[in-house]
């Protein structure tokens, strides 16, 4: 018997940015590496990370993650001054940076982080080109989601 082995390694999610999926229409997704310090990796392993109000900016032909909060562990704060909200450089190909920068400049889209996950032994961030939702669009999405839940609930109870 041949066992089918998955070619794709398991991605363990560290943090999700649920607010981004609520506030934006996701156009296209990219995976980027992060430049981190040692204490930041330890904090990520401990799950002390938050992406809620973070976004991506472009400076000098590079992409930077702004506003991601990595809380330092108590023992790190004793030895050094840790900045939990410092800007972190994203590792992307030039072609990807050009595509993202062009879409932000020409189409008025924005780049937001969706999640932080482990890929093998590296921390990766999934970023997305996104278009902002209007308030009525958000309400419509909520109504549609509630209707789907109600429909499944009724079908489950009768079927």
Curated annotation (Swiss-Prot):
Keywords: Cytoplasm, RNA-binding. Gene3D superfamilies: 2.40.280.10. GO terms for cellular component: cytosol. Its main location: cytoplasm. The keyword Cytoplasm applies. CDD domains: SmpB. GO terms for molecular function: RNA binding. It is found in: Cytoplasm. InterPro entries: SmpB, SsrA-bd_prot, SsrA-bd_prot_CS. GO terms for biological process: trans-translation. It holds the Pfam family SmpB. PROSITE patterns: SSRP. NCBIfam families: PRK05422.1, smpB. Belongs to the SmpB family. Required for rescue of stalled ribosomes mediated by trans-translation. Binds to transfer-messenger RNA (tmRNA), required for stable association of tmRNA with ribosomes. tmRNA and SmpB together mimic tRNA shape, replacing the anticodon stem-loop with SmpB. tmRNA is encoded by the ssrA gene; the 2 termini fold to resemble tRNA(Ala) and it encodes a 'tag peptide', a short internal open reading frame. During trans-translation Ala-aminoacylated tmRNA acts like a tRNA, entering the A-site of stalled ribosomes, displacing the stalled mRNA. This is SsrA-binding protein. The gene is smpB.
């Amino acid at each position: 018997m041949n066992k089918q082995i998955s070619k794709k390694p398991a991605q363990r999610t560290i943090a999700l940015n649920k607010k981004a999926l609520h506030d934006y229409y996701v156009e296209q997704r990219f995976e980027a590496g992060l430049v981190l310090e040692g204490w930041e990796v330890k904090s990520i392993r401990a799950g002390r990370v938050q992406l809620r109000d973070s976004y991506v900016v472009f400076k000098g032909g590079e992409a930077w993650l702004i506003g991601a909060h990595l809380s330092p562990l108590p023992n790190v704060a004793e030895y050094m001054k840790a900045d939990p909200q410092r800007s972190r450089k994203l590792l992307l190909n030039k072609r990807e940076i050009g595509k993202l920068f062009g879409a932000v400049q020409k189409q008025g889209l924005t780049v937001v982080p969706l999640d932080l996950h482990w890929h093998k032994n590296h921390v990766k961030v999934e970023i997305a080109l996104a278009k902002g939702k209007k308030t009525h669009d958000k309400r419509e999405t909520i109504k549609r989601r509630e209707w789907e839940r109600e429909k499944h609930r009724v079908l489950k109870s009768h079927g």
